[in-house]
Amino acid sequence: MQSFEKEFLKPRSINIEKISEIHSKITLEPLERGFGHTLGNALRRILLSSMPGCAITEVEIEGVLHEYGTKEGVREDVLEILLNLKTLAINMYVKDSIVLTLKKTGIGPVIASDIEYDSSIISIVNPNHIICCITDQDTSIIMRIKVQRGRGYVPAFSRFSSDDQHDLPIGRLLLDACYSPVERISYTVEAARVEKRTDLDKLIIDMETNGTIDPEEAIRRAATILSDQLSSFIDLKDVHQPEVKEEKPEFDPSLLNLVDDLELTVRSANCLKAESIHYIGDLVQKTEVELLKTPNLGKKSLTEIKDVLASRGLSLGMRLDNWPPKHLSEQ
């Protein structure tokens, strides 16, 4: 008998239209009715929120104390410089975090390729990207730029505790990090036909990236993430937690208490100790006849002992298996 999942159509045609290096259209058809929106929306959300990438998270500009200032001899203010830095497309191959240096002197644009870096560790996809423009021949600009790997969108101050925020050195400028390499994605669902069936879906995904990843590779990664998350449901079973049975104590805890806890008269207590009756468990195993044979213990003391035991729900002549417990016998 054919399993039910094989009754569903799978895309027979996957067409990739490469509009540019960073822009592609991917078409999948045919899909069962409704699956176009189901898959399209799931992939879109993953591509926008969960794709790993690299972003600039911290910047220090020599001579600048805060983001609302300006740099003499530079056309852009600090806020505009930071916005330009945020749009740098960077790939990091080895490390999860690295600090880069930028130094430039003299009139002219400061571009991404002016950043000093090891090409075996990172690459800058848009090296001609303008960061700022120097308008004075004697002006120098020196920056320290921290690049980190991550995913999604992370606000600047969420990366630090409240105590760490107060300890940040003056002049360190924090940036909100958008790690996702996907800049724009949309999908549409059109009608598809297979033989006589006309109620099928065609899914068209239109996507642009920042150039650090091919659109096709981004789709593959998103599909892998989705598949991995759904794999937990494939072998879904109703797992019952094993019933934990409370272990009943081998003996009534009160039997492990010393005879002194009964607060007997001094005469009765001394008679019991003389017979090596130290625990209540030792006492309740004795019969009335055995106790009356104890030197200096008369009927009055016996009655006292019986009354005290009865007030605790105990009596003489009780049978206790495995007495004394191991930890008492070792004492």
Curated annotation (Swiss-Prot):
Transmembrane segments: none annotated. It catalyses: RNA(n) + a ribonucleoside 5'-triphosphate = RNA(n+1) + diphosphate. GO terms for molecular function: DNA binding; DNA-directed RNA polymerase activity; protein dimerization activity. Keywords: DNA-directed RNA polymerase, Nucleotidyltransferase, Transcription, Transferase. Residues 1-237 are annotated as: Alpha N-terminal domain (alpha-NTD). Residues 251-331 are annotated as: Alpha C-terminal domain (alpha-CTD). Pfam families: RNA_pol_A_bac (PF01000), RNA_pol_A_CTD (PF03118), RNA_pol_L (PF01193). Its EC number is 2.7.7.6. GO terms for biological process: DNA-templated transcription. InterPro entries: DNA-dir_RNA_pol_insert (IPR011262), DNA-dir_RNA_pol_RpoA/D/Rpb3 (IPR011263), DNA-dir_RpoA (IPR011773), RBP11-like (IPR036603), RNAP_asu_C (IPR011260), RNApol_insert_sf (IPR036643). One of its GO terms (cellular component) is DNA-directed RNA polymerase complex. Disulfide bonds: none annotated. Belongs to the RNA polymerase alpha chain family. DNA-dependent RNA polymerase catalyzes the transcription of DNA into RNA using the four ribonucleoside triphosphates as substrates. The N-terminal domain is essential for RNAP assembly and basal transcription, whereas the C-terminal domain is involved in interaction with transcriptional regulators and with upstream promoter elements. Homodimer. The RNAP catalytic core consists of 2 alpha, 1 beta, 1 beta' and 1 omega subunit. When a sigma factor is associated with the core the holoenzyme is formed, which can initiate transcription. This is DNA-directed RNA polymerase subunit alpha. It comes from Blochmanniella floridana.
